[in-house]
Amino acid sequence: MLFAAALSAQEAKYLSSTEIRAEFDKLAKAEPDWCKIEELPGKVFGLYAVRLARHKEPVNRPAIVVLGSLRGDELSPALACLEMARAMLVRAKPDLPVRFGAWLQVVEVIFIPTPCASSRDLVLGAKPTAVAGVLAPLDDDRDLATDEDGLEDVNGDGVISQLRIKRQGGRYRVSSRDVCALIECAPGELGAYDLIWEGFDNDGDGQINEDPRGSITLANDFAIRWSDKQPGANRFPMLTAESRALADFFVAHPNISAAINLRSLGGALTVAGGQPQAPEAPAGRGRRTPPQGDGARDKQVGDALQKLFVENTGYKPRQGEEPESEGAGNVADWLYEACGAYAMNYYLARLPEPEKGDKPPREENPPTKDEAAQLEWLKHAPEDYLEWKSFKHATLGDVEIGGWKAVARRDVKPAHAIEAATKALDFLWALCDATARLRITKLEAKDLGDGTFKIRLTLSNEGALDYKPQHAAQSRIGLPLWVTLVEDKKIELVSGARRQSAENINGGATATFEWVVRAKDPFDFMKFKVEGERCMPLEESKSPKGCEEWKE
């Protein structure tokens, strides 16, 4: 979590969605054994999966998916995805002393870098503007026309910025700390200005920007505690081609055990934990009592993920800093509750903290959160702010145009995104290491006489994460794990199901499976198979006499 120091003269730049795809295509061409690109269902522009694994060995593996932000006004996550993939493939080459080469044989990493491709490209357009969601024509003012009255470059300076109207009792006041910052007044406080984005009254209804370019916030379009009151909500959830394509891909790939939703600006890692528990209702007929310890195990895993995050990024919490809220219907909650995957939001950067030596003395009226954020952005990115200039507006008369650009205060600089990707890659590496990895660690036999043996197989999870979250196990999300004693004429099954299942195996824990068999020759081999949606296929063969001695 960082902002880099001063940038070099050769500053990095953000790439369009088409350019991002072209760079991934180059990686796939250069490293066909490690990198494959798969179009998501529906063939929506910008929606594809970059799959990194040892593709020469096409076996099922647990997978971690990295999403390049579901907000169209954030550019840095897609660039970070590209930089992370590049670094992983360099490290995965077998002729280098690397760590990722071994992991990509047992874990698959999937990047979906540009879920909101069309919207993010507007930020890079000739007259940049920011749209948070996927583009969708909407009639916001119910005049039977769509998107006809939105932001425009009124003064022709090539930039869309703010427009302020001087009015006694207006909604905004000038900051006493810096005249560049306009602060929304507290209730009962009289301001000096009204503030809007640049625009005209294009449809002659007396309003400005009341029907801008329509969009649906993809980040909150998923059917989990969805709300039509959420800003940018559609009429119903998951009606967009983008949300359907993502959902279809996730459902078709149940091996996805963890997901990272990369975001641009924020604070600490947030881990999806399900619906907050409501206060317990009075005892009564028909009331369901939740099982004891409901969600406790997933909270433990969430705490472990937070620890991994701090250890691998150097993140230091700040006083008064609260976790970011992703709102209703967000993708992380949906992945956790509907798909049974550990899901988290990872923020590449946060606002720079004032240097300790520059801290002002304790104030009676400290700045509001928005005021403090504006003041820090003025220090960090003064080029995103324009001086106010007088202008004669066709509808509003004498106004001033300037202030913040429409695309300001949403993203880190490209060089910062590339540097932040290094920290994100360290966290991704730690997550690969923590992912559930199953191994047959022991086969034991007890001689019951007359060629009969009691057999016990021990299956261990050598990762820190559970095979699936506790919520998935309690909700009966279908992620079966099967252990089979393969049928063989030489080995007769006396008791025990030939194919047995385990609901879950916690990180660092074991599960045991037992059979009673009869062998004509105690040195004949038995064959065992382990199969699951989130594990590599495992096989083990041993004779009853070749097994370890049974220990009670």
Residue spans for each PLM region:
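Short amphipathic, basic-aromatic surface patches that mediate peripheral association
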Residues: 459-474
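Short proline/glycine- and polar residue-rich coil/turn motifs
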Residues: 42, 501-509
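Metallocarboxypeptidase
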Residues: 36, 46-48, 67, 109, ...
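Short solvent-exposed strand-capping/beta-turn motif centered on an Asx-Ser/Thr pair
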Residues: 460-464, 520-522, 533
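Short, hydrophobic beta-strand segments
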Residues: 513-521
